[in-house]
Amino acid sequence: MVKLFVIVILALIAVAFGQHGHGGQDQHGYGHGQQAVYGKGHEGHGVNNLGQDGHGQHGYAHGHSDQHGHGGQHGQHDGYKNRGY
Protein backbone atom coordinates (compact mmCIF):
# COMPACT_ATOMS: atom_id res chain seq x y z
CA MET A 1 0.00 0.00 0.00
CA VAL A 2 2.85 2.33 0.85
CA LYS A 3 4.52 1.48 -2.45
CA LEU A 4 1.34 2.36 -4.35
CA PHE A 5 1.13 5.68 -2.50
CA VAL A 6 4.72 6.50 -3.42
CA ILE A 7 4.03 5.67 -7.07
CA VAL A 8 1.02 7.98 -7.08
CA ILE A 9 3.05 10.81 -5.55
CA LEU A 10 5.84 10.31 -8.09
CA ALA A 11 3.27 10.26 -10.88
CA LEU A 12 1.86 13.58 -9.70
CA ILE A 13 5.36 15.04 -9.58
CA ALA A 14 6.02 13.75 -13.09
CA VAL A 15 2.86 15.46 -14.34
CA ALA A 16 3.80 18.68 -12.58
CA PHE A 17 7.32 18.83 -13.94
CA GLY A 18 7.17 16.66 -17.04
CA GLN A 19 6.08 19.58 -19.21
CA HIS A 20 9.23 21.40 -18.16
CA GLY A 21 11.61 18.50 -18.64
CA HIS A 22 14.57 18.72 -20.97
CA GLY A 23 13.65 15.73 -23.10
CA GLY A 24 12.67 17.68 -26.18
CA GLN A 25 15.80 19.79 -26.05
CA ASP A 26 18.18 16.95 -25.35
CA GLN A 27 20.06 15.92 -28.48
CA HIS A 28 20.46 12.45 -27.01
CA GLY A 29 16.79 11.63 -26.75
CA TYR A 30 13.24 12.62 -26.06
CA GLY A 31 12.22 11.53 -22.60
CA HIS A 32 8.87 12.81 -21.43
CA GLY A 33 8.14 12.84 -17.73
CA GLN A 34 4.42 13.04 -18.33
CA GLN A 35 4.36 9.57 -19.83
CA ALA A 36 5.87 8.15 -16.66
CA VAL A 37 2.38 8.50 -15.18
CA TYR A 38 1.29 5.50 -17.19
CA GLY A 39 3.82 3.22 -15.55
CA LYS A 40 6.60 3.71 -18.04
CA GLY A 41 8.58 6.55 -19.47
CA HIS A 42 9.07 7.11 -23.15
CA GLU A 43 11.82 5.01 -24.64
CA GLY A 44 15.01 6.98 -25.06
CA HIS A 45 16.41 6.91 -28.56
CA GLY A 46 20.13 7.45 -28.76
CA VAL A 47 22.42 7.11 -31.74
CA ASN A 48 25.90 5.73 -31.27
CA ASN A 49 28.95 6.71 -33.29
CA LEU A 50 28.16 4.05 -35.87
CA GLY A 51 24.86 5.76 -36.60
CA GLN A 52 22.72 3.00 -35.14
CA ASP A 53 19.84 3.57 -32.80
CA GLY A 54 19.98 2.32 -29.25
CA HIS A 55 16.66 2.16 -27.46
CA GLY A 56 16.88 2.86 -23.74
CA GLN A 57 14.33 1.16 -21.54
CA HIS A 58 15.35 2.82 -18.29
CA GLY A 59 12.34 5.08 -18.36
CA TYR A 60 10.13 2.12 -17.48
CA ALA A 61 11.42 2.05 -13.93
CA HIS A 62 12.57 5.61 -13.46
CA GLY A 63 10.12 8.26 -14.48
CA HIS A 64 12.48 11.00 -13.36
CA SER A 65 15.05 9.89 -15.93
CA ASP A 66 12.62 10.61 -18.73
CA GLN A 67 11.42 13.75 -17.04
CA HIS A 68 14.89 15.14 -17.38
CA GLY A 69 15.40 13.81 -20.86
CA HIS A 70 17.97 11.22 -19.88
CA GLY A 71 16.23 8.37 -21.62
CA GLY A 72 18.17 9.05 -24.79
CA GLN A 73 21.47 8.89 -22.99
CA HIS A 74 20.60 5.44 -21.77
CA GLY A 75 19.59 4.61 -25.31
CA GLN A 76 22.97 5.68 -26.58
CA HIS A 77 24.66 3.43 -24.07
CA ASP A 78 22.38 0.58 -25.05
CA GLY A 79 23.37 1.18 -28.66
CA TYR A 80 27.00 0.57 -27.81
CA LYS A 81 26.06 -2.43 -25.73
CA ASN A 82 24.04 -3.92 -28.57
CA ARG A 83 27.06 -3.65 -30.83
CA GLY A 84 29.27 -5.49 -28.37
CA TYR A 85 31.15 -2.40 -27.25
Curated annotation (Swiss-Prot):
Tissue specificity as recorded in UniProt: Hemolymph.
Chain intervals for the UniProt region annotation (2 X 7 AA repeats of Q-H-G-H-G-G-Q): 19-73
Comp. bias regions, Basic and acidic residues: 63-85
Heme listed as a keyword: no
Keywords carried by this UniProt record: Antimicrobial, Fungicide, Repeat, Signal
Sequence repeat positions: 19-25, 67-73
Segment forming the signal sequence: 1-18
GO biological process, one term: killing of cells of another organism
PTM (free text): The N-terminus is blocked.
Region spans: Disordered: 22-85
Source organism superkingdom: Eukaryota
Keyword Signal included in the entry's annotation: yes
Segments of skewed composition (Gly residues): 22-32
Role description: This protein inhibits the growth of a variety of fungal species. The antifungal activity of this protein is enhanced by the presence of sarcotoxin IA.
Assembly mode: Homodimer.
Record's protein name: Antifungal protein
